[in-house]
Regions:
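Acidic-and-aromatic substrate-binding clefts and catalytic sites of carbohydrate-active enzymes
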Residues: 26-31, 49-59, 81-83, 123, ...
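Active-site groove signature of glycoside hydrolases
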Residues: 102-126
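Short cysteine clusters
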Residues: 306-315, 355-361, 365
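Beta/alpha (TIM)-barrel catalytic core signal, keyed to glycine-rich beta->alpha loops juxtaposed to Asp/Glu
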Residues: 120-323, 333-347, 373
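Active-site mouth loops of central-metabolism enzymes
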Residues: 21-31, 78-97, 123, 127, ...
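Conserved, mostly hydrophobic/aromatic
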Residues: 8, 20, 48, 61, ...
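N-terminal binding-site loop/beta-alpha segment at the start of enzyme catalytic domains
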Residues: 1-78, 110, 137, 143
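Short, acidic/polar
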Residues: 28-40, 91-108, 154-162, 246-254
């Protein structure tokens, strides 16, 4: 079947669903960078995230991209600098500027497709970025054509929402997986995996995270995903906070079915791991299906919350229930229905007003969603 591509928000870029993080590029004395980039090119993976500031890693990537730079969308991080022989997240403008120039030199390119303002998890930090010169510098780089689009990476939905609503970013790099999505906003990313937070049963997605995804969808801000596998813990029953292992395909599919998500950055360490992620594109719907696993999570309940898994299908009237529900959620989260949401709803082949209230969808839903009521509401809101 081959790689699928998605629009990255309103940037005009078409991103491969499977992207690649740089975690494994340093393996085998940095030779892994060329191995993975060559493999990515062969299989249509065109999106690479480079958060690391290690000059040897950046140089290895620059060498690997020689002759094929234009085949890739490079998402590289402003404010990730190398100082005194180690990585540093910096908001010092002199350090940031020097780090950016060094990045371009080592990557052997004169522009970055997505200049990602690096790792902002505190509201006070976002305010510093806004008022301390970092955002202004990013805007200057964009005006010069040295970065084509401005992004922000964050693990905190409160900060991410503020950045998205500011209208200043076009791409959000955000941590997305079914366990993180249960947790409220926190300025300490380590709290997302704190075992204490999972001791008591958890119910449904954190409302702020849901609002973030829907706001990105409405405003045309594309999401690139990090932490889809929770650092690998979600793939192992003994390490997963959910108490049950998920597969690579299930983790990828969960992230790719969130609103506004364009590409998942797989932090692979070997050709075998990258191959497994790429093979998602040819996996069956049964292999991708995360709903049965979620329904069996001993510590987590998604009762009443639509996961867009399409287990409700087939509909006798051929309504795409998952899409209708997604547009309904986008509509009711605002005081009025935005034209972009209405337009997306209009082009659906069948609409909620065609629902005959037979209830077969609800009998199939593993999460007890009130689908018939959702169809009634959607028909009322959208007028058909």
């Amino acid at each position: 079947m081959g790689m699928h591509y998605r629009q990255l928000g309103n940037t005009g870029l078409m991103a491969s669903e499977i992207g690649m993080g740089c975690e494994g590029f340093g393996e085998d004395n940095y030779a892994m960078a060329k191995t993975l980039i060559d493999m990515a090119k062969e299989h249509g993976v065109n999106y690479i995230d480079l958060y690391a500031s290690d000059p040897k890693l950046r140089a290895a990537v620059g060498e690997a991209l020689c002759g094929c730079r234009e085949k890739f969308i490079i998402q590289s991080h402003i404010c990730s600098v190398w100082k005194d022989g180690q990585y540093k997240r910096s908001r010092d403008l002199l350090e940031v500027k020097a780090g950016f120039e060094d990045m371009l030199r080592l990557l052997q390119t004169d522009y970055i497709d997505v200049g990602m303002i690096h790792y902002c998890d505190a509201v006070s930090d976002w305010e510093e970025i806004l008022n301390g010169g970092i955002l202004q510098y990013a805007l200057e780089l964009k005006e010069q054509g040295r970065i084509r689009h401005i992004g922000l990476s964050s693990h905190n939905p409160e900060v991410a929402l503020a950045a998205v609503r500011s209208g200043q970013i076009e791409v959000l790099m955000f941590s997305v997986n079914p366990c993180y999505d249960l947790q409220p906003a926190d300025e300490d990313v380590e709290q997302l995996w704190n075992a204490e937070k999972y001791k008591n049963p958890l119910v449904n997605m954190d409302p702020l995270r849901q609002e973030l995804y829907e706001t990105c969808q409405r405003m045309g801000v594309g999401i690139t995903v990090m932490k889809a596998f929770g650092g690998g813990d979600l793939l192992k029953e003994e390490l997963s906070p959910a108490g049950k292992a998920l597969t690579v395909y299930q983790c990828l599919h969960y992230a790719l079915t969130r609103p506004a998500v364009a590409s998942v950055m797989a932090g692979v360490h070997s050709a075998e791991q990258l191959s497994q992620c790429i093979s998602y594109e040819d996996a069956s719907e049964e292999e991708k299906d995360y709903a049965p696993a979620f329904a069996e999570f001993p510590k987590i309940s998604w009762e009443g919350h639509c996961m867009y898994c399409s287990h409700c299908a087939p509909c006798p009237k051929k309504i795409d229930v998952a899409s209708v529900t997604k547009f309904l959620n986008l509509a009711v989260s605002q005081d009025c229905v935005l034209e972009t949401v209405r337009e997306h709803y209009e082009v659906l082949e069948h609409h909620a007003g065609e629902c005959i209230q037979c209830g077969t969808c609800e009998s199939r839903c593993p999460f007890g969603v009130s689908i018939m009521e959702n169809m009634r509401r959607a028909a009322e809101i959208f007028g058909k």
